[in-house]
Amino acid sequence: CQNECCGISSLRERNYCANLVCINCFCQGRTYKICRCFFSIHAIR
């Protein structure tokens, strides 16, 4: 869930993140979004 393009669609982000819960997200520069992530089997949203 790191280095995603900023402004990525929520659906694609859910697919990309799979079972990761991402917090403290911020954009670095104009291209990448950095997140702190942790694994969770309950992250099915």
Swiss-Prot record:
Tissue: Expressed by the venom gland.
GO MF annotation terms: potassium channel regulator activity; toxin activity
A GO cellular-component term linked to this record: extracellular region
Broad class of where this protein is predominantly found: secreted
Keyword Cell membrane recorded: no
Subcellular location: Secreted
Keywords: Ion channel impairing toxin, Neurotoxin, Potassium channel impairing toxin, Secreted, Toxin
Function of the protein: Inhibits potassium channels.
Protein name: Putative potassium channel blocker
Organism of derivation: Hottentotta tamulus
